[in-house]
A protein has these predicted regions:
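N-terminal signal peptide c-region/cleavage motif recognized by signal peptidases
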Residues: 15-18
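Bacterial N-terminal signal peptides that target proteins for export
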Residues: 1-7
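Binuclear metal-dependent hydrolase catalytic cores
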Residues: 21-142
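Short, linear, compositionally biased motifs with a strong N-terminal bias
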Residues: 11-12
């Protein structure tokens, strides 16, 4: 049920931007971007970050899964560190979705909760996920 809801929400977000594809310069637009922040596996490959992606809609990032290095990967793509995606500045990481609670998808959660807060996120992280997600986040904050 949760995965269906998540996939439906993501499809709606992306489909709202469909008219952009009709213009000649849609690739230059930053209205909607799908950014692979990590494509790694549970194995600790040094050249791959853990599984995570960001859907950036009108500059607002929505993270899906938070493998190892998610905050650093996002920040490396922000203008502060030489990237071009303003929405991925650490203080903008405010919406997060977990698909499941395997460690390779969750180990970046403490970094996402705490680092973004220390660098100026002005509201609590909005976290959505399967049963057990709230408990995990609460333990990080203890």
């Amino acid at each position: 049920m949760f995965k269906h809801t998540l996939l439906t929400a993501l499809a709606v977000l992306i489909s709202l931007q469909a008219p952009m594809c009709l213009s000649d310069d849609w690739r230059k637009s930053d209205i909607t971007q799908l950014v692979m922040l990590g494509t790694g596996t549970p194995n600790p490959f040094p050249d791959r970050s853990g599984p995570s992606l960001a859907i950036v809609v009108n500059g607002e990032p929505y993270l899906v899964d938070f493998g190892p290095g998610v905050v650093r990967q996002a920040s490396s793509l922000s203008p502060e560190y030489g990237g071009k995606i303003r929405g991925l500045a650490v203080e903008n990481l405010k919406h997060a979705f977990l698909t499941h609670l395997h460690s390779d998808h969750t180990v970046g959660l403490p970094d996402l909760i705490l680092t973004a807060w220390t660098v100026g996120r002005d509201s609590p992280l909005k976290l959505f996920g399967p049963e057990g997600t709230k408990h995990m986040a609460d333990k990080v904050l203890e």
